[in-house]
Each structure stands twice: as structure tokens, then as C-alpha cells.
Amino acid sequence: MAVERIIFIRPGETDWNKLERWQGWVAVPLNEHGRQQSEALARFMRSIGMTALYTSDLKRALQTAEILSRFGTFELIPDERLRERNIGLWQGLTLDEMRKWYADEYAAMLKDADTYRIPGGESREDVRVRMKAAFADVLAQAKGETVGILTHTTALKVLMEDLFPGYNPLAVNLGNTSVTTMRRSGDSWKLVAVDDCLHLEGLRTSAVTELEAKQHDPRDR
């Protein structure tokens, strides 16, 4: 059976999310609020018939996936290609600190947002290549109509840019445990929900702007 619906999920909240510190590949665990978010999402998703959940192997993602698995019978499949962008020397910093302490490097990134490779880290193009490969493998290997992909903000946005021409990552927020859903439409895909957080029922969620944003978006607070 071909995959007809894919549900993308962002991990639950960590303390670094609250502090607006960029995590990259750092093994930051969920905080208590992030666990509550994940449990709320698990209750929401337990009846949707998901057969497999492909997940980033970063700690915050795996912890979110493990909570979801308590409420479902799907197969849990870690994949390092679904990790967030590795931001090298900038990991653990706020956006303001990056701009202040690495002003030249940050300016260079703004001039070449797709191919600039952060010192010790990745470019957006690096992330796009591995995300496209992971996505292709999901479609080739998955069994069942509905599968999930638990990944991170930048990783998901670069994939969306590839799948949906005209997609603007700076115009889209993705909150913690948000759900973004797409359905197959002939030979292509159609977005049917973006940043859906209705399952949180009053629980706080937060989003981060893109590294390339020229200033903070107040919606990200």
C-alpha cells in the first residue's frame, strides 16, 4: 500500500527552547512542559492509524517519539538524517549572540543563505540533501497509508521548500509538537495542515525564527 498521508511532528519543548538557545545537535532533553505537550499529542494521535514513525535520533526527538509510542502500535524507526541542522560553533547561542559574537560569519550567511556552511556545522543545502534522501526512503520503504516523520524546524522547512515551490520558511512558524500534514494528490503532495497545535488545549508552545531572519519576529516569543 502506497503512503497517502504524512504527518510531520516537531519535538516537545526543552529548556533551551524557553531560553531561545539554538540546539542543533546538542543532546538537550525535554523539560516537564515538553513531556506534557508530547503526552497531549499522543492522546490526539492514537486513533489516526499511523503505521510507522520515522524520527530524528537527537535526544529531544527520541524522547518525544517514545512518549508517542506509549499510546500507539506503530513501528518506531530512528534515522540520523532527520536531525536538525548542525550549527557548529553557534550551538547553544541565542540569535542575538550569534549576530554579536560572529558578526562577519553571520553576514556571510545572509549573503548566501543556502550554501553557507556554518563553522563546524552544515549549510541549508547540506540539510536539504539528507532530508530529501530520508524522505525518498520513507516513501519507498513505508507500509501503510499514514506514516509520521518526527523532525526539526529547519530540517522540515528545507524539505517543504523542495516539495512546494514558493514556500517561504520565514513566513511559517512551527511550534513545539506542532503537526504539519500533507496528502498525496496524484503524483505530487498537497499541504492540508501547517503548525497545527490544537491538541495542546491551552498548553504553551513556542517557535523559533530562521537563522537567516534579519530581526526577531514577535510571534516567536
Which residues does each PLM region occupy?
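Acidic, low-complexity terminal tails and accessory targeting/binding regions
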Residues: 2-4, 87-97, 140, 145, ...
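General small-molecule cofactor/ligand-binding pocket signal
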Residues: 7, 77-79, 192
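Loop-to-helix element that buttresses phosphate recognition and phosphoryl-transfer chemistry
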Residues: 7-68, 118-132
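Phosphate-coordination/substrate-recognition cap region in phosphate-metabolizing enzymes
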Residues: 40-106, 175
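Alpha-helix capping/helix-boundary segments
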Residues: 60, 155-156
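Active-site signature of alpha/beta-hydrolase-fold catalytic machinery across serine-
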Residues: 67, 158-162
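Short glycine/proline- and acidic residue-enriched helix-loop micro-motifs
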Residues: 105-126, 215-221
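GST-like fold's C-terminal all-alpha helical module
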Residues: 127-153, 159
